[in-house]
Amino acid sequence: APSEPHHPGDQATPDQLAQYYSDLYQYITFITRPRF
């Protein structure tokens, strides 16, 4: 399973934040999808 992404912090660039939210979305989708 993917590990939970870490927030890049208050000094993060927009690109870093975009990558973080992309990774977070994929992580949440993975852990919440049915396991059938």
UniProtKB/Swiss-Prot annotation:
Coiled coil: none annotated. Keywords: Amidation, Hormone, Secreted. GO terms for biological process: feeding behavior; neuropeptide signaling pathway. Pfam families: Hormone_3. CDD domains: PAH. InterPro entries: Pancreatic_hormone-like, Pancreatic_hormone-like_CS. It is found in: Secreted. GO terms for molecular function: neuropeptide hormone activity; neuropeptide Y receptor binding. SMART domains: PAH. The modification Phenylalanine amide is found at F36. GO terms for cellular component: extracellular space. Belongs to the NPY family. Hormone secreted by pancreatic cells that acts as a regulator of pancreatic and gastrointestinal functions. PANTHER family: NEUROPEPTIDE Y/PANCREATIC HORMONE/PEPTIDE YY, PANCREATIC POLYPEPTIDE PROHORMONE. This is Pancreatic polypeptide. It comes from Aquarana catesbeiana. The lineage of its organism: Eukaryota, Metazoa, Chordata, Craniata, Vertebrata.
